[in-house]
Amino acid sequence: MNATTSAAAYGPLAGADLEAELAQARVTDDAVRDAAIVDRDGGASVVPLARRRPGSPAPGDAVTLSGVSKRFGTRTVLDNVELGIARGSFVAIVGRSGCGKSTLLRLVAGLETPSSGALATRGEGGGTLDTRIMYQDARLLPWKTVLQNVMLGLGRGARDRARAVLDEVGLLERANDWPAQLSGGQRQRVALARALVHRPQLLLLDEPLGALDALTRIEMHALIERLWREHRFTALLVTHDVQEAVALGDRILLIEQGRVALDQQVPLDRPRARASAAFAALEDRVLQRVLAGGPGGADQEAAREVDHVRPVGQIRWAV
């Protein structure tokens, strides 16, 4: 895929354009409301969510970047990036604010196109790589219940799948509640369920836990790791938290001044023992490398605010 390829070629991403998504939701409100009736006494049965594929992930790279650069006006945010993301791996991306890590995630998602170079995504069997993205803001529709939010964009037949994935994230009993009734961590669990109900091959995580307290973050780490191990999707996490990167990643990438400055494997057993000397040593090694890079200048990614205004109708609503 070259720099001129349409973002649509990346395949489905957590629903269609925002306007189309909201229009679809209004059309199907009655059907979804009927489907969202859940027995509060817990008597309703739950059909386990089918695993997308059993066993080990298929070999090869799910995402490949070859000489990819991204510029906003005169600012170069990513500079000649060469990178392959192995299918079924969990890759964490760290770096200072403005280094280009979120821009990299948006390129992989198809929300931006490269200024130069080639970016290829490949699903199993050579098909489309089904991709979902999760942000720090859960982006739940406040006028829909938890179950309706998970079912957004899906038909009545998805009710059992939605209930099953809510059960997996520990929120089946909150299916009839409104988003305003949930804590921040619970809202992020709903956002995660809404991504997983589509059984994605690639899950992109753009600092999804940044606004949560420390204990809730640790709980979410365990949940994300468990679901990743069960479903074997490819995961790409952007985070400022080096400890989070070591806790979740098989591999840690440091983006510095638009380039991959460090590519560190994480040779630690799962689940990660955070109190172990090996964990602390690896965390310190990566953190010291991040600090050694210096502040690196102004926040280049903020250039999107000035130089790259995207029409509302083109904005994709992720997750």
Swiss-Prot record:
The complex is composed of two ATP-binding proteins (SsuB), two transmembrane proteins (SsuC) and a solute-binding protein (SsuA). GO terms for molecular function: ATP binding; ATP hydrolysis activity. Disulfide bonds: none annotated. Keywords: ATP-binding, Cell inner membrane, Cell membrane, Membrane, Nucleotide-binding, Translocase, Transport. Belongs to the ABC transporter superfamily. Aliphatic sulfonates importer (TC 3.A.1.17.2) family. It comes from the Bacteria. Pfam families: ABC_tran. It comes from Burkholderia ambifaria (strain ATCC BAA-244 / DSM 16087 / CCUG 44356 / LMG 19182 / AMMD) (Burkholderia cepacia (strain AMMD)). Its EC number is 7.6.2.14. It is an enzyme of class 7 (translocase). It catalyses: ATP + H2O + aliphatic sulfonate-[sulfonate-binding protein]Side 1 = ADP + phosphate + aliphatic sulfonateSide 2 + [sulfonate-binding protein]Side 1. This is Aliphatic sulfonates import ATP-binding protein SsuB. GO terms for cellular component: plasma membrane. Part of the ABC transporter complex SsuABC involved in aliphatic sulfonates import. Responsible for energy coupling to the transport system. It is found in: Cell inner membrane. InterPro entries: AAA+_ATPase, ABC_transporter-like_ATP-bd, ABC_transporter-like_CS, ABC_transporter_ATP-bind, P-loop_NTPase. The gene is ssuB.
